[in-house]
Amino acid sequence: TMELLEDLIEQVRQLPMVNFIEKNSLVHANEFTVAKGAPWGLARISHRDPLSLGSFDQYLYDSNGGTGVTSYVIDTGVNVHHEQFEGRAKWGKTIPQGDEDEDGNGHGTHCAGTIGSNAYGVAKNAEIVAVKVLRSNGSGSMSDVIKGVEFAVKSHQDSVKKGKNSFSTANMSLGGGKSPALDLAVNAAVKAGLHFAVAAGNENQDACNTSPASAENAITVGASTISDARAYFSNYGKCVDIFAPGLNILSTYIGSDAATAYLSGTSMASPHIAGLLTYYLSLQPSSDSEFFIGAEGITPAQLKKNLIAFGTPDVLADIPADTPNILAFNGAGQNLTKFWGH
């Protein structure tokens, strides 16, 4: 590199062997963390290439991920005292009448662990809030689910008013038949500022036939396998936005404060995305960055767009023609300028 005076620069630029002149700039190495012995799902979303013997249990990430962001787990409840949550999980609300403030099923605890637990979570510093809408048998009424969504929205709005933790995500790993009322509630929640991930469903059918998978403002998540194929049960179609690991996923569970379990389903894929939303929200560019979004932060619509654009394209097998072939990616703990520049 040469230091050039302004008039010389123009002369040099005209020379036939000069393609372009660029101002010299400092480049910083980004410190990133590698979690060894991580679940394969975390490893997969932090590598562009298919997993190998050297990478299958390594999660590459920014250790600040999740800080200051709240994630609402709208599910069977959460084992909030589990040691993996390190005191970051709290009980929000129990919607089904007469039900206890605990996860008697395990499903919600497993999802919460993928979002923000210490060993199994995408965003390891996230604040987790349990919103119980399903009973211990794993089922519940559509009206209770809608009430749970409304509770999350109100809680988010309350924290925005207080000026703290003003970024919130939500995960809903549940589904049923097509319900315009539920889709409406989820779409309204996203408009109110909640960054929302929902499961595509496990019927190996068009996700547009089910709710909340057909809620267009949310991010609808299909399930992929360790060998980069669509999981045999995963719903598909144009209502699916992205895929994430969903077969044999290790996470937190119930029964003790150290319990774990392997579960499969688009229910396990969706919290990878809720975790990623939480992760990215906490790592938004600072005010001195050229990518600074503004004091209000990134909107759910824009973050959804960036997340999909930044995903790894065309690596999954058995994806029907009308379904986006995109696998979630976290940036491997490196510089995220490409993510914010989308």
UniProtKB/Swiss-Prot annotation:
Biological process, per Gene Ontology: proteolysis
Domain of life the protein comes from: Eukaryota
Entries under InterPro entries matching the protein: PCSK9_ProteinaseK-like, Peptidase_S8/S53_dom, Peptidase_S8/S53_dom_sf, Peptidase_S8_Asp-AS, Peptidase_S8_His-AS, Peptidase_S8_Ser-AS, Peptidase_S8_subtilisin-like, Peptidase_S8_subtilisin-rel
Leading EC class: hydrolase
Domain (Inhibitor I9) ranges: 1-30
A molecular-function term among this protein's GO annotations: serine-type endopeptidase activity
CDD domains given in the database record: Peptidases_S8_PCSK9_ProteinaseK_like (cd04077)
EC number: 3.4.21.-
Residue positions assigned to the propeptide: 1-30
SUPFAM superfamilies documented for this protein: Subtilisin-like
CC annotations in GO: extracellular space
Active-site annotation: 75 (charge relay system), 107 (charge relay system), 267 (charge relay system)
Glycosylation sites: 137, 171, 335
Keyword Nucleotide-binding carried by entry: no
This protein's UniProt keywords: Allergen, Glycoprotein, Hydrolase, Protease, Serine protease, Zymogen
Family per record: Belongs to the peptidase S8 family.
PANTHER family referenced in this protein's UniProt entry, alphabetically: CEREVISIN-RELATED (PTHR43806:SF11), PEPTIDASE S8 (PTHR43806)
Function according to Swiss-Prot or TrEMBL: Serine protease.
Name of the protein in its database record: Subtilisin-like serine protease Rho m 2.0101
Organism: Rhodotorula mucilaginosa (Yeast)
Upper taxonomic lineage: Eukaryota, Fungi, Dikarya, Basidiomycota, Pucciniomycotina
